[in-house]
């Protein structure tokens, strides 16, 4: 095989591989997944804002102005700071207030997804219940069914 044949062989293989990849990438499932990931990322930002800008301030107002994001426990005696950012600079800290906020984010996302999926399942169930009943058999189908049933019973025509 000379170099020209080798180049042609690799071009054909590459073209076939590129076509297979294009077919895979253009399948509905891959495109749907990409859209889902993009929407999910945007939804994550909305939930983060909901928790940080709406829910946590309400909880903070109820609890007398507590800001959970700065709650931490120092794991070293050298940590003397009052804010989480400063405490992290001074040494090891257990940032449990931040963990609480992230946990609330998760619970809200899970609750919203549960509500959406539950609603979709109810709509799907209602759609299945409202489907029209199967069509009544035609006269020809009824006669064929009767003939079949008679043949099964062995009551065919007498000679």
UniProtKB/Swiss-Prot annotation:
Keyword presence, Cell inner membrane: yes
Localization terms from the record: Cell inner membrane
Gene3D superfamilies: Large-conductance mechanosensitive channel, MscL, domain 1
Domain of life of the organism encoding this protein: Bacteria
Membrane topology according to the record: Multi-pass membrane protein
Keyword terms: Cell inner membrane, Cell membrane, Ion channel, Ion transport, Membrane, Transmembrane, Transmembrane helix, Transport
TM annotation in the entry: 35-55, 97-117
One Gene Ontology term, aspect cellular component: plasma membrane
UniProt main location, coarse: membrane
Membership in a protein family: Belongs to the MscL family.
Functional note: Channel that opens in response to stretch forces in the membrane lipid bilayer. May participate in the regulation of osmotic pressure changes within the cell.
Name assigned to this protein: Large-conductance mechanosensitive channel
Organism lineage string: Bacteria, Pseudomonadati, Pseudomonadota, Alphaproteobacteria, Hyphomicrobiales
